[in-house]
């Protein structure tokens, strides 16, 4: 089943490039003050650059794509070539966009910075007045606007500034020199280009330092400044091609935070019970561990966090584990912003959950029993149950990430938590154990979240396995529109008329179909890889899949993907990256089978 996030980041490559363009425009202020005719020249260069890019995109993709990146390239050349004849500057723009970008496949595919590719031949053809910029404090607005872009490749940008600063200290330059020499300009707008600069911290810092040092030490010739950055571009290209080939050892919790979705959470709303079966709390009885296990097996209790794994087998694995210390974690995190039924259960059926917990404790001896939540409520906890609040990041509720966060134990991809003596059960699974043992009930019902993103609002429903998704949605939100189901907002799929609730469904929602613009203009920003809990080179895998090179993509270990959807959510190019990674993962698994 192909799942995808129903929500996406509001940021895009176009937003980022428009902000860069604004900073580039600000660097022209002192130039325009000297020669107002340069305003017309700037507009001509930018228009020419965008025209070339539009034509190339139509020829390659058979459709229009935003050409703001071409405007940035033309703007950079305009700022650095003041005094060069107009025909030479136009030639530089053409060289930059054709030989610096389009011959490599377009935006995001180029190994060299297009602006510098266009500037390099001009350095041989014309005499440049150095430094690049006029001696004016009017450069300050451009410098201030460009500083935030250090965050894109911070190590390289800071390294460049340190390199130029080292030369300044040696020669006693005044602070104004850092502006007119172009140090801030290059550090923030050129060597932070995510397409052509590596994300490796040490190499980025070192390469940036050497490029910055050369750029000022040989101030008499800008050729050194440009060629040193281009050489670093080539080094970065080789490094980035090799990134992600090392097999991921363990999952990591990224810094990805997802927005709150609902204006009305539904935590205080009445349960929508579609089972026609009353939920009855029963008195606690004493059961031998063997009887508890037998009833769990007979009731076919399964993991209700979304995986649907057999709880009886999981318990046996923990019991048989050779681990000296065993832990029991009740997972109530709900890191997906679309879910709320686990928190609702803790509020309304906490006593039943504690009863289920004690039944499980009768089966094995645990050093600690821990309840993990994202937002703690005022719940009376039983004795010896430890409460642990985890970071509000996605996907903090994933089993191995939770173990790492709570127990400070990092498990490799091959290690199974239950075999290591760690039992992680969703709070609804624990409730289901309570019903199975004390109520002798089959695990054929479940609580789930039903939502309508058009309002946006959600509520908790109790349904029977096998019920049609559309019927449940109609009962909760009549006439609400297109239906989706799955593990949450980040792991949803389109619900057809005959789609039913199975063990893996804990979320049903009416929502507009997500708009993935599927832009081919990946900027190489690396946000998808940074937000991947498995540490995969997501953009590289996706590019290879699109090129029909799934065997080559296998070298980047797509089988380690946990299908969390973080990459699709955060992609600034609007690509459904998780779908590409899943294709590569499926190809690898089929090959191994």
Walk through the language-model features, giving the residues of each.
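N-terminal signal-anchor module of multipass membrane proteins
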Residues: 1-57, 249-259
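Alpha-helical transmembrane segments in multi-pass membrane proteins
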Residues: 19-26, 41-53, 57, 70-81, ...
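Loop-to-transmembrane alpha-helix initiation sites
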Residues: 90, 111-115, 136-138, 176-183, ...
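Long hydrophobic alpha-helical segments that form multi-pass transmembrane helix bundles
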Residues: 105-150, 157
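Iron-sulfur-cluster electron-transfer modules
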Residues: 256-383, 388-406, 555-559, 563-568, ...
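Hydrophobic alpha-helical positions that pack around
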Residues: 365-469, 475-480, 488
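Ferredoxin-type iron-sulfur electron-transfer modules in oxidoreductases and energy-metabolism complexes
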Residues: 508-519, 529, 533-593
């Amino acid at each position: 089943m192909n799942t995808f996030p129903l929500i996406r980041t509001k940021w895009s490559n176009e937003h980022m490039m428009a902000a860069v363009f604004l900073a580039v425009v600000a660097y022209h202020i002192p130039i325009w003050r000297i020669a107002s005719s340069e305003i017309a020249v700037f507009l001509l260069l930018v228009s020419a650059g965008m025209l070339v890019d539009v034509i190339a995109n139509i020829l390659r993709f058979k459709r229009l794509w935003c050409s703001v990146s071409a405007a940035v390239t033309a703007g950079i050349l305009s700022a650095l070539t003041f005094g060069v004849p107009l025909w030479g500057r136009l030639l530089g723009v053409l060289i930059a966009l054709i030989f610096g970008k389009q011959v490599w496949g377009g935006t995001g595919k180029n190994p060299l910075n297009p602006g510098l590719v266009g500037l390099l031949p001009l350095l041989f053809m014309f005499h440049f007045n150095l430094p690049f910029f006029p001696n004016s404090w009017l450069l300050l607005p451009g410098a201030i606007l460009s500083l935030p872009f250090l965050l894109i490749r911070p190590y390289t940008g800071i390294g460049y500034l340190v390199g130029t600063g080292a030369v300044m200290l040696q020669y006693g330059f005044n602070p104004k020199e850092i502006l007119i020499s172009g140090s801030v300009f290059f550090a923030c707008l050129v060597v932070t280009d995510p397409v052509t600069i590596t994300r490796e911290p040490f190499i980025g810092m070192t390469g940036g330092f050497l490029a910055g040092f050369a750029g000022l030490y040989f101030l008499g010739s800008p050729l050194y400044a440009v060629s040193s950055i281009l050489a670093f571009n080539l080094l970065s290209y080789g490094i980035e091609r090799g990134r992600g080939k090392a097999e991921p050892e363990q999952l990591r919790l990224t810094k990805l935070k997802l927005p709150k979705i609902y204006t009305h959470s539904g935590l205080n709303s009445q349960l929508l019970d579609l089972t026609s079966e009353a939920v009855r709390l029963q008195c606690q009885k004493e059961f031998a561990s063997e009887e508890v296990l037998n009833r769990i097996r007979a009731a076919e209790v399964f993991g209700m966090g979304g995986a649907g794994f057999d709880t009886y087998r999981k318990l046996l694995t923990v019991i048989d584990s050779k681990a000296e210390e065993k832990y029991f974690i009740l997972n109530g995190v709900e890191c997906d912003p679309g879910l709320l039924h686990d928190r609702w259960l803790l509020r309304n059926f906490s006593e039943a959950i504690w009863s289920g917990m004690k039944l499980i404790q009768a089966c094995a001896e645990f050093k600690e029993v821990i309840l993990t939540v994202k937002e703690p409520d005022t719940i009376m906890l039983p004795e010896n149950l430890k409460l642990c609040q985890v970071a509000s990041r996605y996907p903090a509720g994933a089993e191995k990430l939770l173990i790492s966060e709570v127990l400070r134990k990092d498990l490799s991809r091959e290690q199974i938590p239950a075999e290591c003596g760690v039992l992680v059960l969703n709070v609804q699974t624990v409730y289901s154990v309570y019903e199975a043992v004390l109520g002798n009930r089959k695990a054929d019902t479940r609580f789930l979240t039903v939502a309508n993103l058009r309002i946006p609002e959600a509520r908790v429903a109790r349904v029977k396995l096998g019920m049609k998704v559309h019927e449940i949605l109609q009962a909760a939100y009549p006439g609400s529109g297109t239906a989706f189901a799955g593990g949450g907002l980040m792991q949803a799929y389109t619900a057809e008329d005959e789609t039913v609730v199975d063990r893996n469904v804990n979320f049903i929602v009416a929502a507009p179909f997500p708009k993935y613009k599927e832009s081919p203009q990946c900027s190489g920003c690396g946000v998808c890889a940074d937000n991947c809990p498995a540490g995969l080179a997501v953009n590289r895998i996706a590019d290879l899949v699109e090129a029909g090179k799934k065997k080559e993509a296998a070298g980047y270990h797509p089988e380690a993907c946990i299908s969390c959807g973080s990459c699709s959510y955060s992609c600034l190019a609007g690509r459904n990256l998780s779908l590409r990674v899943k294709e590569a993962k499926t190809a690898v698994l089929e090959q191994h089978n």
